[in-house]
């Protein structure tokens, strides 16, 4: 009953908000909301010093009974995702707010270790995780690559803003940018320790997930679901993460004039094109295993995959992946322009956990993403960026207009149109909001459009 009521509330909210603001007003509201997510703010008034200026990933209202009665709220209310901070850097830069972008970069400086290691998420009200407490902490190389790429984006945009050529000499002549380039190299060097070097391995050239993972487990005795923490390297290879990493290594190689990064990026590119593209699916696979592909259908591997293929000069794959992304489209109300894209097209909602699927969907324990209607604004905006790069500006405008239906009164864009415990939340999110800003600003600013994930 809870899920039905929550879903109805969200649908009522969406229907009541659609088309309330002009595009410019919607972007400005999103920007103001993003600024309000930086700590210190009204939620975390006294963040620990090393976490100052990070952004809170979600807008979680303490006064909302759904949060107040959630036992996990005390642990997640101050949570700041590395990926979200990377997006915030890019969004702030696209808004011309270099000060806030640099504040986040400085915070990352305070939290990286001497080997270039970054955690996937950070608390802001206390020091978890740090060298004294890494329990339940995970690290993802894809998120670290996003952080590195965002810093490089800042460097390049800052030089452009000062009418300077984007090259190594101009970076080294600026003390701030020189430090930031060194930070990027530190991050890249750590990521490359995870690149598969065995040429006999089907994953050769690709980068594995990272360190530690969480697994959902159904407790039959307590009739409940909980997360289990598993320590050690994460052996899977995410194609989406490797696409992120390619753009980071490629741009770092260009700016730093470093052949090590150039060779690593080239190897990664060739591995993605050879091992990750699926001709039958007409998109990139979700992952690559030791002997075969993980062929689950993921939206990012169609939309971001299209951006990657276009960047490396394979327009045929770019167009095919872009066209495939339309299969993920959901229209909830054509008359009111309520539509978007779902994150997956195949697999159980709780993949490979049939007992967990049964717990959450007792009437339909085999429910899969194919039949599960949920709009994902962040992913929908990824499709919009792919459309923008391929010259379909009308589609970009339409998606932006549709995403305004998911903008909360506070200005934040909902993470998803319905709750899926442990996976998707209906709370306003940095991810959705930052992507909204990035697409809108890139639509009107050709320099930003070309700078972000540009062509080789």
Regions found by a protein language model. Name each.
Residues 1-3:
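N-terminal secretory signal peptides that target proteins for export/translocation
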Residues 6-16:
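Bacterial N-terminal signal peptides
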Residues 22-71, 79-83, 110, 116-142, ...:
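Extended ligand-binding clefts on enzyme/binding-domain cores
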Residues 85-101, 108, 302-309, 386-390, ...:
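Alpha-helical support elements that line or immediately flank enzyme active sites
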Residues 87, 91, 150, 248-251, ...:
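"A position-specific structural signal for the A-helix of alpha-solenoid helical repeats
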Residues 375-380, 384-407:
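Surface-exposed substrate-engagement region within the catalytic domains
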């Amino acid at each position: 009953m809870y899920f039905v009521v929550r879903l109805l509330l969200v649908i009522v909210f969406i229907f009541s908000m659609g088309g309330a603001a002009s595009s410019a007003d919607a972007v400005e509201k999103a920007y103001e909301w993003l600024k309000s997510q930086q700590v210190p703010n009204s939620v975390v008034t006294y963040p620990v010093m090393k976490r100052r200026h990070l952004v809170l990933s979600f807008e979680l209202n303490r006064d909302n009974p759904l949060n107040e009665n959630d036992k996990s709220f005390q642990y997640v209310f101050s949570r700041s995702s590395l990926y979200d901070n990377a997006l915030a850097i890019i969004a702030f830069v696209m808004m011309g707010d270099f000060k806030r972008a640099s504040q986040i970069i400085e915070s990352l400086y305070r939290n990286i270790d001497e080997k270039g290691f970054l955690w996937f998420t950070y608390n802001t009200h206390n020091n978890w995780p740090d060298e004294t407490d890494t329990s339940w902490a995970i690290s993802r190389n894809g998120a670290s690559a996003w952080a590195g790429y965002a810093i490089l984006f800042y460097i390049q945009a800052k030089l452009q803003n000062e009418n300077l050529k984007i090259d190594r000499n101009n970076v080294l002549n600026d003390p701030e940018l020189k430090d930031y380039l060194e930070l990027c190299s530190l991050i890249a060097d750590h990521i490359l320790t995870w690149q598969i070097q065995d040429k006999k391995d089907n994953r050769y050239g690709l980068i594995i997930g990272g360190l530690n993972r969480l697994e959902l487990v159904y407790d039959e005795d307590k009739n409940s679901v909980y997360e289990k923490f598993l320590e050690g390297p994460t052996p899977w290879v995410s194609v989406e993460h490797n696409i992120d990493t390619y753009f980071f290594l490629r741009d770092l190689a260009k700016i730093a004039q470093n052949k090590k990064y150039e060779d690593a990026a080239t190897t990664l590119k060739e591995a993605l094109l050879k091992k990750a593209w699926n001709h039958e699916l007409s998109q990139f696979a979700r992952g690559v295993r030791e002997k075969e592909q993980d062929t689950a259908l993921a939206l990012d591997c169609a939309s971001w995959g299209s951006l990657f293929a276009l960047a490396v000069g394979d327009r045929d794959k770019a167009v095919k992946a872009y066209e495939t992304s339309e299969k993920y489209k959901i229209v909830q109300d054509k008359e009111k322009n309520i539509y978007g894209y779902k994150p997956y097209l195949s697999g159980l909602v709780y993949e490979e956990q049939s007992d967990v699927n049964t717990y959450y969907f007792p009437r339909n324990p085999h429910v899969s993403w194919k039949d599960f209607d949920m709009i994902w604004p962040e992913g929908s905006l990824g499709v919009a960026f792919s459309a923008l790069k391929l010259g379909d500006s009308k589609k970009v405008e339409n998606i932006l207009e549709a995403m305004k239906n998911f903008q909360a009164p506070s200005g934040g864009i909902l993470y998803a149109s319905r709750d899926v415990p442990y996976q998707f939340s209906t709370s306003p999110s940095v991810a959705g909001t930052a992507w909204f800003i990035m697409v809108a600003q890139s639509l009107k600013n050709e320099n930003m459009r070309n700078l972000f994930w540009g062509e080789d």
